[in-house]
């Protein structure tokens, strides 16, 4: 009998419900036992693999023969924060479907700011016909923070459209067609950025990086009348009081936010009704769960053939 797959899944939308994941993995892994922990009985000694989403701290210690952990989402901060996490490879999801969806989201919102869609939506509501001068994409400087798989793809698609694109990452990266900055060059990167797109992982080093100090360094001479931020990374990357304060005093012209420190976003949050904020419910890259389950099944099969795992997380860096 092949090594069992344990599912440890907390919360999620209907499509991410734990029972739905059991159905998917039973379908794509018909040759191995699949157990939804908390519902299904299984001998812990049989479990070789775990597919997880926001597992409770310490939950994986019950499997002494665990060989690989698969995180079902792109962000692994909730997993690596567990001090008791077994010392086995942690694999993050990196399917093409997720990358395409994130790029769609980023490109859509950069274009909406570039083409002043917020202004025209307001004009429509007020029945005002008042076109504004429109600049070319080459006149807008977009800066992408985070040059992993998602950031690289979004940056390159934006560049193909014609935007002036640069990227920043903690360690040096090279992306064809993109001006790349790293580490201590953050200030230089921010100074040439009109629209700041954040796709960083959440680590101790990046927590709270979207703050007033960062926003103060953004370009002030751009075509949009002030800098704009787009955060589709993690809620912990942003200091929300700083965002609100900077929107109110003009340090920021607008913000698009897909993630928040508390989710679901509380009904009394000022973000809901702020005229300079566009928000979405953490679904910028809501990946097809069927694609994720196939990805995990293929990784397990390759691992059992002796092939190396792909997209293994570095525990020290958190990505």
Role assignments for model-derived ranges:
Residues 42-43, 59-62, 188-192, 270-271:
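Structural alpha-helical scaffold elements that stabilize or flank donor/cofactor-binding regions
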Residues 48-124, 135:
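Phosphate/diphosphate ligand-binding glycine-rich loop within oxidoreductases
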Residues 120-153:
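Glycine-rich NAD(P)-binding loop of Rossmann-like domains
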